[in-house]
């Protein structure tokens, strides 16, 4: 009897892994705003939905790392839905306080940029499967603002 249950579990697990799932990628990370307290970057994420109906996004959570340190994080509750059989573009604002940027002076160096890693968890609600988190990550360099960005 136990082996029958194990076979049933394996069968269901195999079928669930074969179900197509939405996939995403970070397409760009750009400077959005500079103010007295922080720098705001905008991460552009594209997500493809293989299903013929829209899928609600429950939450977007993200962490922004540089030089092995977390320099920004946040959550965006209920940001909308993924379009049916289409690509959906999502904008994720990432705010980094200047106090943290100044602590990264070693990484900034001569070229006035920071190396980053952005990790995003896109939590969606799939029928039958339930809540499912799509992990999306990106690594790259971002130029820091200069005085001309302020004026």
UniProtKB/Swiss-Prot annotation:
Going by the entry's taxonomy, the superkingdom of the source organism is recorded as: Eukaryota
Q: Which Gene3D superfamilies match?
A: 2.60.40.1820
Q: Name one GO cellular component term.
A: cytosol
Q: Report the SUPFAM superfamilies cross-referenced here.
A: LEA14-like (SSF117070)
Q: Which SMART domains match?
A: WHy
Task: List the GO biological process terms.
Answer: defense response to fungus; response to desiccation; response to high light intensity; response to wounding
Task: Write the protein's name.
Answer: Probable desiccation-related protein LEA14
Q: Where does this protein come from, organism-wise?
A: Arabidopsis thaliana
């Amino acid at each position: 009897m136990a082996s029958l249950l194990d076979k049933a579990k394996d069968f269901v697990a195999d079928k669930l892994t074969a179900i197509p799932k939405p996939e995403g990628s970070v397409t760009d990370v750009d400077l959005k705003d500079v103010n007295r307290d922080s720098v705001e970057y905008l991460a552009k994420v594209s997500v493809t939905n293989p299903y013929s109906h829209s899928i609600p996004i429950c939450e977007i959570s993200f962490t922004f790392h540089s030089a092995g340190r977390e320099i920004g994080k946040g959550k965006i509750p209920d940001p909308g839905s993924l379009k049916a059989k289409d690509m959906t573009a999502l904008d994720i604002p990432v705010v980094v306080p200047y106090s943290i940027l100044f602590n990264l002076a070693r990484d900034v160096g001569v070229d006035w940029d920071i190396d980053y890693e952005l990790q995003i968890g896109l939590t969606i609600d799939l029928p039958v499967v339930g809540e499912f988190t799509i992990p999306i990550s990106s690594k790259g360099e971002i130029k820091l603002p200069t005085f001309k960005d302020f004026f």
